Amino acid sequence: MLTLMFTLLLCQAQPTARQWNSEVTAGWNLGNQFECSAPGQDGESIDIGEPDGADNAETAWGNPVVTKRTIKAVRAAGFNAIRIPVRWQCHVSNPYAMSISKVWMGRIKEVIDWCLDYDMKVIVNVHHDKWLESRPHYENKEENCQKLALLWMNIANELGTYDYRVAFAGTNEVHVPDNWGKPTAENLDVQNAYNQTFVDIVRATGGNNIKRHIIVQTYVCNADYGLYNGDFAIPTDINGNGNDYMSVELHYYNPWEYAGSGECYYWGEPYKQYGAAQSDETTMTGFFDRLANEWGSKGLGIVIGEWGLTDHYKGEEADRIHENMSYYCKTFVAEARKRGFSTFVWDNNRFGNGEDMFGIFDRNKNMAIKSGWMIKGIKEGVAESAKFK
């Protein structure tokens, strides 16, 4: 009886998903770290197991080992939440039970503990498990859902004693390889099945997981494939929860030619004279309003699990371009927070000029801030949004 009462008290202490998101001032992604493939392993492999060197996957893509100093630096810069993308498929000790290597799970727990030591919220997901992400087809649906249920049963049981600050996200960018475009009805149906499987199994593990903040995804984490035509089916949570403890996740690198590929150097109305992208503040706020109207109105939280700006500049305009990037960050964070969304900026520790240069902190140089314009804009956005609270 005492155990039951204690469990109920723990569950009652859990905030809703919308409360959880509203408490995130600014979130950061520990990118290109724990979602790496094992050293020497094909990153697109669907193999499940423990290949040689799997315990060293954390550094397989060139980034140094994460330390408590890594987390401390992120917290000191003003972030109070971290998303930890995790690839599990090369750390499975028993593929039939989808059991996770004790070494790998211990390492993930260690990093979570560091985050909690600094009173940061955490998202843990399944990221780059290619057997799951790259096969959104009916021929794989039943097998994948069974494996996903076993995997999340193991993760949820291992992490179930953590308090409300730790949230679970079911999948990542599920898509047919080399096809980021419009999905088929089959692709969408499989993504919806993944989401329901994830919700069912996490709740079934009981304890804190009954009302833990759980995060489900639109296909390829592109909200356009969930906002229209009933493409996204809101999973059914257990009785008594409604939609209160669930968020929908999307990723936002818009407009891509500015945020992702770096072909366009300016964004926003104040920079129109320099050839700014056609997509602007009105585009962004209109899109955010659609998210709030479609999902927020139904009680769901909204998590922008990834967003960012690749560093790109030209000649003598570098300072003005970086000033413009600060303006974008300020606008993005302020508008998202006004609507209660949580946001997690992507940082892959890559620096340079052009596509995929999303580095903010230099992990190879004691977490020195290399993209100060990003931090500046994010902080200004947080301050701006506070005026509307």
What kind of region is each of these model predictions?
Residues 32-36, 81, 87-92, 128-132, ...:
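Solvent-exposed loop/turn segments at secondary-structure junctions
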Residues 11-81:
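N-terminal carbohydrate-binding accessory modules
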Residues 55, 88-106, 129-144, 176-184, ...:
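Surface-exposed, active-site-proximal loop segments in enzymatic domains
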Residues 60-82, 92, 96-128, 132-170, ...:
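An active-site-proximal structural segment forming one wall of the substrate-binding cleft
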Residues 314-389:
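Aromatic-rich peripheral "rim/lid" segments of glycoside hydrolase catalytic domains that contact
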Residues 142-280, 289-310, 338-344:
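Active-site region of glycoside hydrolase catalytic domains
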Residues 1-8:
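Bacterial N-terminal signal peptides
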Residues 65-87, 290-298, 333-335, 339-342:
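Catalytic domains of carbohydrate-active enzymes, especially glycoside hydrolases
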